[in-house]
C-alpha cells in the first residue's frame, strides 16, 4: 500500500485540466480560487483569533518597574540578538566579529548557485540548502544559549 496518491495520466478529465494549466508540473489543485479565496482567509482569521484569545486570557505581566538610579548587574540584549551578541563577545577582534556577521548573508547568497549545478535535480529536494539551514539553526541556538552564560562558558556551554 502506498502513502502517495499517484495521478492517473490516462484519465481524460485530468489530462484536460493539466492541458488548461490547472495545477503545477506535479499533480494538485490550482491555487486560484481554492487556496487564495478559501483557505488563506481561514488561516489568517484563525491566527488573529488565537493571538487575541491568548492576549485576553493570559495577559503578559510587564515585570518590575525601571529604576533609573540602579544599574542591573548584567545587561543583556533582547533574545533575538543573543547569537550576534555572543559572537561579538567571544571573538577578540572587533573587525573579525563584524566580518563574521557579514559572512552570513554572503554565504546565504551563494547557496542557490551551489544548488543550481544539477539542472535535472528535483526542486523539492535541496540537500545543500537543507544542510546550511540545519547548521545555521543549530549554531544560532548554540550561540544564543551561550550568550546567557559567563564568557568562559560562552562557546562550550559548560559541557567541555
From Swiss-Prot:
Transmembrane spans: 36-56, 95-115, 131-151
Principal location: plastid
GO cellular component, one term: chloroplast thylakoid membrane
Topology of this chain in the membrane: Multi-pass membrane protein
A GO molecular-function descriptor: oxidoreductase activity
Subcellular location: Plastid, Chloroplast thylakoid membrane
InterPro entries registered for this protein in UniProt: Cyt_b/b6_C, Cyt_b/b6_C_sf, Cyt_b6/f_cplx_suIV, Cytochrome_b_C_euk/bac
Keywords, ordered alphabetically: Chloroplast, Electron transport, Membrane, Photosynthesis, Plastid, Thylakoid, Transmembrane, Transmembrane helix, Transport
GO biological process assignments: photosynthetic electron transport chain
Pfam families the record matches: Cytochrom_B_C (PF00032)
Record function comment: Component of the cytochrome b6-f complex, which mediates electron transfer between photosystem II (PSII) and photosystem I (PSI), cyclic electron flow around PSI, and state transitions.
Quaternary state and interactors: The 4 large subunits of the cytochrome b6-f complex are cytochrome b6, subunit IV (17 kDa polypeptide, petD), cytochrome f and the Rieske protein, while the 4 small subunits are petG, petL, petM and petN. The complex functions as a dimer.
Family from the record: Belongs to the cytochrome b family. PetD subfamily.
Stated name of the protein: Cytochrome b6-f complex subunit 4
Lineage, uppermost ranks: Eukaryota, Haptista, Haptophyta, Prymnesiophyceae, Isochrysidales
Amino acid at each position: 500500500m502506498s502513502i502517495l496518491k499517484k495521478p492517473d495520466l490516462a484519465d481524460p478529465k485530468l489530462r484536460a485540466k493539466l492541458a488548461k494549466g490547472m495545477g503545477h508540473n506535479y499533480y494538485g489543485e490550482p491555487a486560484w480560487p481554492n487556496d487564495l479565496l478559501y483557505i488563506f482567509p481561514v488561516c489568517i482569521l484563525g491566527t488573529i483569533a488565537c493571538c487575541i484569545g491568548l492576549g485576553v486570557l493570559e495577559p503578559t505581566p510587564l515585570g518590575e518597574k525601571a529604576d533609573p538610579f540602579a544599574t542591573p548587574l548584567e545587561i543583556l540584549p533582547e533574545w533575538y540578538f543573543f547569537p550576534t551578541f555572543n559572537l561579538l563577545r567571544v571573538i577578540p577582534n572587533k573587525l573579525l566579529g563584524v566580518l563574521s556577521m557579514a559572512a552570513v548573508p554572503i554565504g546565504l547568497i551563494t547557496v542557490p548557485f551551489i544548488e543550481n549545478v544539477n539542472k535535472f535535480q528535483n526542486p523539492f529536494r535541496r540537500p545543500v540548502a537543507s544542510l546550511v539551514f540545519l547548521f545555521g539553526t543549530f549554531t544560532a541556538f548554540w550561540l544564543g544559549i551561550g550568550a546567557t552564560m559567563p564568557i568562559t562558558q560562552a562557546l562550550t556551554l559548560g559541557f567541555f
